[in-house]
């Protein structure tokens, strides 16, 4: 399988997909054709330019407009082809914006501390989440699971066709899946906690990456 990762310098994502023999290609450019690629990963990163969801700047920072164009374009093209997409953290927000949703540009006090990356010590937070019973995600993790958290923004209005499957204990959306396409948007970071880096008591990314790899192999 050949996976396009829409940014440079993503060793954790490459390492995770290497468990399935995937060839990963990093890019900040829009290729002429996506025919050779089986799937797309939209990785974590800086904030999305709010122009893409029709808002003024209101707490967003570290904008990379050029990369946003690449990621949103690739998301649309892979979705049009029905190819699997996995968006993580910012990537989940890119998926939401691609389908017409918007972003909470800066979580309010209290929630922000519950979810944010701490730049001074290089760590994130951990919190309880609830998963929709009977969903494929519940089959992977159960209905209640602790996840890591490294973000100050969050999904606001949910994009068309996307279904919320997981929320944190304070109501922040943590996972969405498209109702008819193999598209998965996860706000937490499975690539930071999987296989040899897995932390006991915290959601292990391995089941999610395995599920995604199976979707790639099945072509849907």
What are these regions (language model features)?
Residues 89:
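Conserved G/P- and acidic residue-centered "switch" motifs that form tight phosphate/ATP-binding loops
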Residues 147, 166-167:
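Short beta-strand
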Residues 147-152, 176:
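Short catalytic/ligand-gating loop segments at beta-alpha or beta-beta junctions
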Residues 93:
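Cytosolic ligand/metal-binding cores
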Residues 142-144:
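Catalytic cores of DNA base-excision repair glycosylases
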Residues 1-86, 96-104, 108-136, 140, ...:
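N-terminal beta1-alpha1 cap of cysteine-dependent amidohydrolase-like domains
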């Amino acid at each position: 399988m050949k996976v396009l990762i829409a940014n440079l310098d993503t060793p954790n994502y490459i390492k995770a997909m290497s468990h399935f023999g995937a060839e990963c290609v990093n890019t900040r450019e829009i290729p002429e054709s996506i025919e050779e690629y089986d799937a797309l990963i939209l990785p974590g990163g800086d904030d999305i330019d709010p122009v893409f969801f029709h808002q003024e700047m209101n707490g967003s920072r570290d904008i990379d407009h050029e990369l946003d164009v690449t990621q949103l374009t690739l998301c649309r093209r892979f979705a049009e082809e029905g190819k699997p997409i996995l968006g993580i953290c910012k990537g989940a927000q890119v998926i939401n914006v691609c389908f017409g949703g918007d972003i909470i540009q800066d979580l309010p006090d209290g929630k922000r501390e519950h979810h944010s990356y701490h730049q001074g010590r290089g760590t994130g937070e951990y919190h309880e989440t609830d998963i929709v019973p009977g969903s494929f995600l519940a089959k992977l993790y159960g209905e209640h699971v602790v996840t890591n958290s490294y973000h100050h923004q969050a999904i606001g209005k949910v994009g068309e066709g996307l279904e919320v499957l997981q929320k944190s204990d304070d109501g922040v959306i943590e996972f969405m899946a498209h109702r008819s396409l193999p598209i998965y948007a996860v706000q937490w970071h499975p690539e930071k906690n999987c296989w040899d880096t897995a932390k006991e008591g915290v959601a292990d990314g391995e089941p999610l990456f395995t599920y995604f790899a199976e979707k790639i192999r099945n072509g849907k």
